[in-house]
Amino acid sequence: MPQEETLSALDYLLNRGYIRHVACSTHPAWRTVEALHIADRKNYPKFICEQPPYSLLDRRIENDIVPMCQAYDLGLMTWSPLAQGVLAGRYQAQDAFPDGSRASQKSIYAERVTDRGIHISQLVSERALAGGQTATALAVAWILHQPAISSVIIGPRTPAHLEDLLRADDIRLSPDDLAWFDTLVPPGTFVSDHFNTAGWRPDAPDGLLTRWDDAE
């Protein structure tokens, strides 16, 4: 669907009081910038926030989404801080998924659980234990220390999970701490595929050319 149609519909809802603001989620950076320019030309409401998945195991938003949000003064609310539970220590092996876990559903969820990601989660857990913290709180704290982050969306299933995650706000990481995380997964790289905006991947949004379409 053309972005002008989407923005026109959002403008209708905003002007009639059905919504207060408009934002986007998991958009490629270029699509968000395109929408901002269309909103300028047409006097439509502008996106105020982008909501992508982001964790230590997939840092690719640092290449374009983060600088875009900084340049255009957009909020950045990230989700999946525990990388589908990998950073919480839920998985012990790439081919051994707990019953009821998302990875046990196979498909893309299983592909996101990698041996490298599990190894990194174990290192994070060891560092957290040495500092009197939990791996989950430390993983969220790491995100809160990154540039441009407005908020982190969490999904606790129990009150105990919530209390643990909220402890992240009390953790202060030093430059040496942050440098240590960078040795595990360098800035802008990934070890687990959670957010791929390549336009020619098999599940690319409708309307974007694939490599094969382009070749024809």
Functional labels for PLM-detected ranges:
Residues 2, 22, 50, 69, ...:
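Conserved, mostly hydrophobic/aromatic
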Residues 28, 54-58, 80-87, 142, ...:
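Glycine-rich beta-alpha junction loops
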